[in-house]
């Protein structure tokens, strides 16, 4: 087998690649849990016009390839696709998560997302979050955003409580319960939960609840205001919401 002299003598131009190396390194340090696609979109949003293949080559040379865990947290499923709403506040999925402090004390998070633009509306953190606390969190959200048409949830005790049912009835909010053992029927927030688990709960050791809250608040600001979402045409949730609130801004203005 013979090789052309051009291929045989090729040496990478490290000086030419230096700006790409620097930009990728800075982005990877700023967003340590991002894979290649997200990092590439970060560079694009910074105005970098480097070729996709070139950036990927350097990404691999820098060994930034995201390591996947050998064991999956959830089994492979065939989820039923959810219909994305056409406007804000049509559908809010809500859910609980669990984790623990370094001392072993367990805490819970109450998560609220808007299906329309995947915006995380709240992550409430405490040792215990009863139904009354759930209602207070929802009141805090609707004070700035308005009431949703419906909320989608599982059959947890706080969510099937009379307290939440009365709140929903008073404000004309429909409660939609998924079937027991079918988390894929709430797929949008399940995906959000996985991202939050991977990038925050599994990534940090929390000594106090306040530490968990502060780190989560910083992450929420990044998630809503900086992170491009493929499902939103690589806009951030805040950009997508602004586009919906300002009809004269066409989608092409964000591309």
Regions found by a protein language model. Give the residues of each.
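C-terminal domain-tail junction helix/linker
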Residues: 169-173, 195-255
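Acidic/histidine-rich, metal-coordinating catalytic segments
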Residues: 138, 145-161, 181, 233-238
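Mobile-element integrase/transposase regions
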Residues: 49-113, 119, 132-140, 144-149, ...
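RNase H-like polynucleotidyl transferase catalytic core
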Residues: 68-73, 150-155, 170-188, 204-209
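Basic, flexible linker segments flanking DNA-binding modules
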Residues: 1-91, 182, 236-245
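Mobile genetic element proteins and their domesticated derivatives, centered on retroelements
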Residues: 1, 8, 24, 39, ...
């Amino acid at each position: 087998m013979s090789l052309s002299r051009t291929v045989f003598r090729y040496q990478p131009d490290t000086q030419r690649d230096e700006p790409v190396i620097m930009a990728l390194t800075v982005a990877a340090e700023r967003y340590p849990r991002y894979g290649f696609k997200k990092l590439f979109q970060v560079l694009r949003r910074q105005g970098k016009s480097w070729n996709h293949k070139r950036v990927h080559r350097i990404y691999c040379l820098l060994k930034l390839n995201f390591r996947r865990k050998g064991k999956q947290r959830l089994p492979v499923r065939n989820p039923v696709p959810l219909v994305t709403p056409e406007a804000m506040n049509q559908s809010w999925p809500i859910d609980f998560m669990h984790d623990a402090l370094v001392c072993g004390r367990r805490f819970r998070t109450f998560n609220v997302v808007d299906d329309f633009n995947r915006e995380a509306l709240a992550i409430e953190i405490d040792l215990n979050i009863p139904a009354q606390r759930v209602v207070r969190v929802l009141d805090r959200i609707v004070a700035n955003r308005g009431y949703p048409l419906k909320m989608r949830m599982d059959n947890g005790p706080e969510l099937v409580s009379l307290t939440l049912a009365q709140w929903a009835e008073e404000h004309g909010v429909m409660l939609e319960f998924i079937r027991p053992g079918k988390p894929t029927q709430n797929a949008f927030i399940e995906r959000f939960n996985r991202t939050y688990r991977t990038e925050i709960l599994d990534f940090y050791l929390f000594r106090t609840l306040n530490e968990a809250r502060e780190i989560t608040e910083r992450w929420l600001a990044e998630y809503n205001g900086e992170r491009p979402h493929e499902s939103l045409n690589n806009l951030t949730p805040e950009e997508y919401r602004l586009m919906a609130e300002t009809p004269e801004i066409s989608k092409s203005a964000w591309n």
